[in-house]
Amino acid sequence: MKVAAIQMVSSAQVEVNLRSAGRLLEAAAADGAELAVLPEYFCLLGHRDTDKLQVQEAFGDGPIQQFLADTARRLHIWIVGGTLPVSSDVPDSADAASRSRVLNTSLVFSPGGQCVARYDKMHLFRFDNGREQYDESRALLPGAQPVTFELPSRDGHRWTVGMSVCYDLRFPELYRRYSAAGADLLLVPSAFTYTTGQAHWELLLRARAVENLAFVAAPAQGGLHENGRQTWGHSMLVDPWGRIAAEQAEGEGVVLAELDIARLREARLQLPALEHRVL
C-alpha cells in the first residue's frame, strides 16, 4: 500500500491552509497514494493558542470536515485529517476552563467521503526550557480513548491502523495497546518543536516502529510559521525494522513510500519479539 505523509508549514489562515492541503493531497493521489495523512494543526497554526477556539467545529459539521470529506471522495483515497479543533461535549455545569477548551481531533475519511474513525489527542504537551514555553492544556482538553480503524487496501490486506498525535509519541504504552489490538501501521501526525524534534523525533519514531514491529507514518509541520514558531519537520515513513523508507527535512511536500505487508510479516517471523513478552 502506498502511503503519503504530508508535510506542511501551516499559517494562521484556515482558507490558505486548506488550499495548500488540497494541492498536496492531489499530488499524493496522482503519485498513487492510497492513504494520505496530514500533519497536526494542518488547518491552523495561529498566533495564539486560543485561536483554535475561533475555528472549532462540532463533530460531523463544519467547513474543515467538509473539505476532508469532499477531497477524500473526489480523489478516492483515504485521508487522515492530522488534527482540527473539535468542540467538546462538556456539560454547561462544567467549570469555565473546561468549557473554553477544545479537543485536538484526528479524523479518518474513507474514499467514499465517510468519517470512519475519530481520535482525540490524549497527552497534552507542556515544555519550558527557560527560552520556549508551551502548554497545550491552556486551550485543549485531553482525549480519553485509544482508537484503531480497519483499512482494506488494494493489495488485499486489511490493515489495522493505530491513531496517535505528536506528544503521544513519548508514551509507549499507547502503542503497546495498539500492538495488542493487531496494529500493523501506526500514525503520528505531529507539529514537533525544532528543539524537541532535533533531539528526539527520529529516535522515538524508529523506537515505536521497532518495539512494535509495525510501520509508522509520521507527517509533520516543518518550517518557520507566521507566529514565529519553528517546527522540526522531517516527516517520514519508517518500516518495522526501524529503517526510514522516505523523509523530507523541511518545507511542504509529499513523503511517499510503498508499505509492503510481506516485509512486516518477514520481520515478525525472523524476530518474534511480540510473542516473547512476559509482562
What positions do the PLM features span?
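Short beta-strand scaffold segments in enzyme catalytic cores
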Residues: 81-83, 104-108, 147-149, 235-237, ...
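Active-site-proximal beta-strand elements of phosphoester/diester hydrolases
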Residues: 1-12, 37, 105, 118, ...
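A short C-terminal boundary segment appended to hydrolase-like catalytic domains
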Residues: 262-279
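Short, acidic/polar
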Residues: 16-27, 170-176
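Active-site catalytic loop in hydrolytic enzyme cores
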Residues: 57, 90-181, 194-203, 270-273
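Cys-nucleophile CN-hydrolase/nitrilase-fold catalytic domain and related Cys-dependent amidase chemistry
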Residues: 14, 23-112, 118-120, 193-208, ...
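CN hydrolase (nitrilase-like) catalytic-core segments centered on the catalytic cysteine
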Residues: 59-80, 160, 166-255
